[in-house]
Amino acid sequence: MGNETSLPMEMCSNFDADEIRRLGKRFRKLDLDNSGALSVDEFMSLPELQQNPLVQRVIDIFDADGNGEVDFKEFIQGVSQFSVKGDKLSKLRFAFRIYDMDNDGYISNGELFQVLKMMVGNNLKDTQLQQIVDKTIGFADKDEDGKISFDEFCSVVGNTDIHKKMVVDV
């Protein structure tokens, strides 16, 4: 990877050239079939993600072009959101996108249910989970349109330190 590849990466990420080189090495190690893109299985070889119930959602968000794989540019842009230099708003937007599965700018009752179901599995009955979803929507949905906008999401989680936990070491 020469300078011609890393310079645009620096411009579209929170990483400097050395960090991009290190990430490039990590990417190439993960790219087991040398295809230039990471499949879901290759992503799952990351120990940090193996136990994460939301790994598929993370991959979906990283996969900007929706082709089912994450190329190096998508990888850099995705991981960049978890950089210590990443800003709070970007981290909140990423967290919001985990829940906004259809990417329409809102978290619906059904989307919140699906994501929470991924997290809790069968530890709660669906009726219990639905009660939590309904209460959460009722609490966060200030304009009472039945869904949570990004602004409403930020009103609820923006005062927490969630963005400080959304950091990976490069």
Curated annotation (Swiss-Prot):
Residues modified to Phosphoserine: 35
GO MF entry, a single one: calcium ion binding
SUPFAM superfamilies (alphabetical): EF-hand
PROSITE patterns in alphabetical order: EF_HAND_1, EF_HAND_2
Gene Ontology CC annotations of this record: calcineurin complex; synaptic vesicle
Binding site for Ca(2+) 2: 63, 65, 67, 69, 74
Alphabetically ordered keywords of this record: Calcium, Metal-binding, Phosphoprotein, Repeat
Other comment: This protein has four functional calcium-binding sites.
Assembly, per entry: Composed of a catalytic subunit (A) and a regulatory subunit (B). Interacts with sra.
Role: Calcineurin is a calcium-binding and calmodulin-binding protein found in all cells from yeast to mammals, and a calcium-dependent, calmodulin-stimulated protein phosphatase.
The protein's name in its UniProt record: Calcineurin subunit B type 2
Lineage summary: Eukaryota, Metazoa, Ecdysozoa, Arthropoda, Hexapoda
Gene for this chain: CanB2
